[in-house]
A protein has these predicted regions:
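Residue-level structural signal for beta-strand termini and adjacent loop
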Residues: 36-37
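Helix-adjacent hinge/juxtasegments
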Residues: 53-86
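A structural signal for isolated positions on well-ordered beta-strands in alpha/beta enzyme cores
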Residues: 24, 68-70, 90-92
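Residue-level recognition of the N-termini of beta-strands and the immediately preceding loop/turn
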Residues: 21, 65-68, 123
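Glycine-rich phosphate-binding loop at the start of an alpha helix
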Residues: 4, 45, 49, 77
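Short beta-strand scaffold segments in enzyme catalytic cores
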Residues: 21-29, 33
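Zinc-dependent deaminase
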Residues: 1-17, 75, 81-134
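A short, polar/charged loop-to-alpha-helix boundary motif
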Residues: 40-54
Length: 134
């Protein structure tokens, strides 16, 4: 299985929940957690944060070293922090923050690349992957 397979799973999950944002966490080529819709009225639970919390619970750990986060959109600062603090090894995302803003979603214009460059524990980033599909 490859990046395309897992990104398609994130896209499918977003669409299944009637949402634009989806996230999948993979370890050892297996899906550990996925999320696509946040609870109504709770802005803390973006697809990425939900998937991270589910993965930590499933693996019974606070660290996700060796895991890859696939997200249909570039993680916002909150979601990037969650990935960073749990030691996710890699983030693969499709649409960019600028794409999200262009389509009317409220965003703080601080990119994952900017945050990553200033972190002490860098995450491997693969940006704009399957951007058009996302």
């Amino acid at each position: 299985m490859n990046n395309e397979f897992f990104m398609k799973k994130a896209i499918e999950d977003a669409k299944a929940h009637g949402h634009h944002f989806g996230a999948v966490i993979v370890k050892d080529n297996k899906i550990i957690a996925k999320a696509g819709k946040r609870p109504r009225g709770d802005a803390r639970f973006h697809a990425e944060t939900q998937a991270i919390l589910k993965a930590c619970k499933k693996l019974k750990t606070r660290t996700l070293k060796g895991c890859i986060l696939y997200a249909t959109c570039e993680p916002c600062p909150m979601c990037f922090y969650m990935a960073w603090i749990t030691n996710i090894s890699k983030i693969v995302y499709g649409a960019t923050l600028q794409d999200s803003i262009k389509y009317g979603f409220p965003e703080i214009e601080v990119t994952a690349k900017f945050l990553n460059e200033r972190s002490g524990n860098k995450i491997e980033l693969k940006d704009s992957f399957m951007r058009d599909e996302c």
